Amino acid sequence: MKNEITVRAICSKNKLINILKNKGFNLIDKFNVKDTYFINKNKKLDEITLNNFFKEYVLLRHIKQYEKSSFEDYYDEFKITYKTKNIASNGDIINQNKYDCKIFNIIDGRKILIALGYKELFTISEEAVIYYNGKINLEIKSVENGDILLELETNKKLDTIDKLKQEIRNLDIPIDESDFFVKKAERKIKDLLGENND
């Protein structure tokens, strides 16, 4: 079971990429994602909290995957992704699971989810690049709300959240260390629930 940390960068994407390149990181992947969030249609918005929303939800994903040879040509992928997260009361993600199913197109995927009893809530778009230094993959996400997020997943050597936190601190890059579990959908959910004061 994999886990991850996601932190907010406190600099521009270009500055962040330059810092990583200077530290020996190289671009290994590039893709854009348009995620549409679905939850069980029987869930009432007034009964949802931020943490229990993330316990179980489904994404309808349109991925623009760039060819690794040049990162210019691309092809489209479509997926339904089922996600579960075990979240502590303070918002830390204890563990999580993800199950992907490739589909042929978004229209039919939406029809299937609605037929299975899900309702559509909102869509979030992001541009993502992954950099690798021979040891770790660092994913940089440029989210439509302006956030620049960095994601680091557990692997054989970095197999705990504490090790991930230490690794990203050791890189000495400009990040907000007040939250290691930033959720890109959090602002949208708070808007839905009427909790956003930003």
Spans of model-derived segments:
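Long, well-ordered alpha-helical scaffolding segments within enzyme catalytic domains
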Residues: 158-176
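Intrinsically disordered, low-complexity regions of eukaryotic proteins
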Residues: 6, 141, 153-155
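N-terminal strand-loop-strand beta-hairpin
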Residues: 1-135, 174-198
